[in-house]
Amino acid sequence: MTTRYKMTMAYDGHLFHGFQLQPDQRTVQGTVEDALKKMTKGKRIIVQGSGRTDAGVHAIGQVIHFDYPGKTIPANRMILALNSMMPTDIIFNNCEIVNENFHARYSIKGKWYRYRVSLDHFVNPFKRFYTGHFSYALDVGKMQEAAKDLLGKHDFTSFAASGGQIEDKVRTIYYVNIAKDEKENEIVFDFIGSGFLYNMVRIMVAALLEIGNGRRPVHDLKRVIAAKDRQEVRQTAQASGLYLYHVFYDEYHKNIDRTGIYN
């Protein structure tokens, strides 16, 4: 007998070699599985994540599930137990007991990624692991206009890094917002879509920054999408600025205001 738990977690990705388990590397999955192994006196419990964030990528709303053997532990006790065993760069924020049909990855209806770009002239030592960096002039209005060309259902081959294992490159982008955070002197990009290819968000950010800086025409993304060629966007924004912000398991929720608040 097992009980399936769905848990939402946040982590600072700076000191992790990504989410996915890797031999002899510190990973998010490995850290959680080690804790569960201690709780079950040596049994390996496989943790399934909503996505495999890369080294240096952060999460505000990563979702996992696992099947815990034996007597059911109430959700409020499970979250307390796991949080007591986590390092300071991981925290669980929610725990639910779900039926066996739920899957953290395959039940997804959409994902929300946020990317932060520091505009400081020099790299801020206190931001270097938590933002990308771009010190050149940017026209936010041009980037906002260009982002409209990403909306809808497209083949995003031009925005997929090599190394991805998924052959179907068609995805739907529901929402893009680009805004200046005056207080932090940052540009904040929000993307919500049915799913995202390997490094897709970071490549889209790199292309939009080139448009904002005048290196590309405003509507160049139409041509890039049609080309279906990764060589059309050779740059990839740094991992440090990317956050997995929210995972949707019901239909896409449109109640998102311009500050990027999900209600």
Swiss-Prot record:
Keywords tagged on the record: Isomerase, tRNA processing
EC category: isomerase
Residues reported to bind substrate: Y113
Active site: D54 (nucleophile)
Top-level taxon in the UniProt lineage: Bacteria
Catalysed reactions, as listed in the record: uridine(38/39/40) in tRNA = pseudouridine(38/39/40) in tRNA
GO biological process: tRNA pseudouridine synthesis
InterPro entries hit by this protein: PsdUridine_synth_cat_dom_sf, PsdUridine_synth_TruA, PsdUridine_synth_TruA_a/b_dom, PsdUridine_synth_TruA_C, TruA/RsuA/RluB/E/F_N
Gene Ontology MF annotations: RNA binding; tRNA pseudouridine(38-40) synthase activity
Coiled-coil segments: none
Gene3D superfamilies cross-referenced by the UniProt entry: Pseudouridine synthase I, catalytic domain, C-terminal subdomain (3.30.70.660), Pseudouridine synthase I, catalytic domain, N-terminal subdomain (3.30.70.580)
EC number: 5.4.99.12
SUPFAM superfamilies: Pseudouridine synthase
Similarity remark: Belongs to the tRNA pseudouridine synthase TruA family.
PANTHER family with a match to the protein in the record: PSEUDOURIDYLATE SYNTHASE (PTHR11142), TRNA PSEUDOURIDINE SYNTHASE-LIKE 1 (PTHR11142:SF0)
Protein name listed in UniProt: tRNA pseudouridine synthase A
Organism: Lactobacillus helveticus (strain DPC 4571)
